[in-house]
Design a protein with these regions (language model features):
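Short, hinge-like loop/turn segments at secondary-structure boundaries
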Residues: 6-8, 36-39, 101, 149, ...
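Active-site cofactor/substrate anionic-group-binding motifs, chiefly glycine-
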Residues: 11, 20-21, 27, 160-163
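Active-site C-terminal subdomain of aminotransferase-like
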Residues: 15-18, 25, 29-133
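Short secondary-structure boundary/hinge segments and terminal tails
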Residues: 28-30, 92, 140-141, 171-173
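Conserved PLP-binding catalytic core of the aspartate aminotransferase-like
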Residues: 110-117, 124-157, 173
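Conserved PLP cofactor-binding pocket of PLP-dependent enzymes
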Residues: 157-174
Length: 174
């Protein structure tokens, strides 16, 4: 699903709070491909934008975008930044190339949406709850054992269906 960023924006302004958007799954996949803030027309209203280069961009690493005060604080206080190494030029180049493709070839997003629509229709036809809002299709199995068995079955059929288990999800919702 897509976070109700319009409502979160209103709340952030009402309570004088910073608005942070983690777009791990939205970059290159929803709306124009520019992420959740762009989807809602709130690009200029987000205080902290973070995301990954590893999902739709096919690279590694991530990013944080914010004003200079916030970035300076993170550079000096964030242990995960202080004790890590910079991305390699090849990884940055791969992410930039993917961004260039997304910007220059709008058919990529069109093909993705066609695939999302097809997948949603197929899941619904099998009696599995699905929506075509995003290209992520959580399918709740239940127990860890059953979920791992389904994941193994899919893998042997040539399909990557990662088993998400506790503590990532609540017990019984694998």
């Amino acid at each position: 699903d897509i976070a109700p960023l319009d409502k979160l924006y209103e709340l952030s302004r009402e309570y004088n709070a910073l608005l942070m958007v983690d777009d791990a799954h939205a970059t290159g996949t929803i709306g124009s491909g520019h992420g959740t803030a762009a989807y809602y027309g709130l690009e200029k209203e987000v205080d902290i934008q973070l995301g990954t280069l590893s999902k739709s961009l096919g690279s590694v690493g991530g990013y944080v975008a914010a004003n200079s005060t916030i970035i300076d604080y993170l550079v000096n206080m964030s242990r995960s930044f202080i004790f890590s190494t910079a991305l390699s030029p090849a990884d940055i180049g791969a992410a930039l190339a993917a961004l260039h493709i997304l910007e220059s070839d709008t058919s990529v997003l069109g093909r993705l949406q066609e695939n999302v629509n097809y997948m949603a229709l197929q899941l619904i036809a099998m009696g599995i709850e699905a929506t075509n809002e995003t290209p992520i299709f959580p399918i709740l199995i239940g127990s860890n054992e059953d979920t791992l068995a389904v994941s193994d079955y899919l893998y042997n059929a040539g399909i990557i269906g990662t088993a998400i288990r506790p503590p990532t999800v609540p017990v019984g919702e694998s």
